[in-house]
Amino acid sequence: MDVAVVREPFNLEQYDRIFLNHEPWVIICNKEHFLAKRPEGVRVSELQDASLIIPIRQPIQNEINSWFNEIASERNIFCLYNSITSVMGFAEHNLGVIICPESAKNLINRETLTYRKIIDPVHESGTYLVKKHLQLMATATEKFWKYVEHQTKSNPSKYKESMR
C-alpha cells in the first residue's frame, strides 16, 4: 500500500502525514431510544446506561474508555465493529448505540435511525493521509500526494490541525 487514510489515534511517528480534517464523535441510535430525545446532543455520562457499540481498533477503544474514566463512570460495551455498516442493524433494532465519527451519519437509514453529537465533553477525531517515511511511490501516487499536500497548504484555515 502506497498511501492510506487513517483516523487518530494512530501511531503517526513512522509516517509522513497530511492532515485532512477533524470531525466530532457522535452516537447513532434508534429514533425511539431515550438518547434520541436529546436534540442538543448527549453527554458522556448519559452513555453509561446504554449498550455501546464501539470501534474494534484498540487505540480508539482506549480513547473512548478514557472518556468514561475521566468522569469515573462505568460503560457497557455491547459489541465491537470493524465496519460500521455491519452493526447498523443492532441500532435499528434498538439493541445498542453506536459511537462513531460524524461522517457515518451519511450511512444511516433516516427512517429508523438518528445521530446525536457527544457534547459534554466534546470529543473529536482527525483523519490523515499517510505514507511511510522515505517510501518510493509510483508516479501517479506521488502526484496525488503532492496534489493533496498543495491543496492543504493553499487553504490552511480549512486544514488546520489542532493540538490534541
Please report, for each region that a protein language model flagged, where it lies by residue.
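Short coil/turn segments
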Residues: 8-10, 25, 30-40, 50-61, ...
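Secondary-structure junction motif
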Residues: 50-72, 137-145, 155-161
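Short beta-strand-centered segments that line the small-molecule binding cleft or hinge
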Residues: 1-29, 38, 66-67, 92-95, ...
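Short beta-strand and adjacent tight-turn residues that come in two discontinuous sequence segments
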Residues: 1-6, 82, 99-101, 105
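A late-sequence structural motif
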Residues: 114-158
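Hydrophobic residues within well-ordered alpha-helices
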Residues: 47, 89-95, 129
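Short beta-strand-to-loop elements that line the ligand-binding cleft
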Residues: 7, 54, 73-83
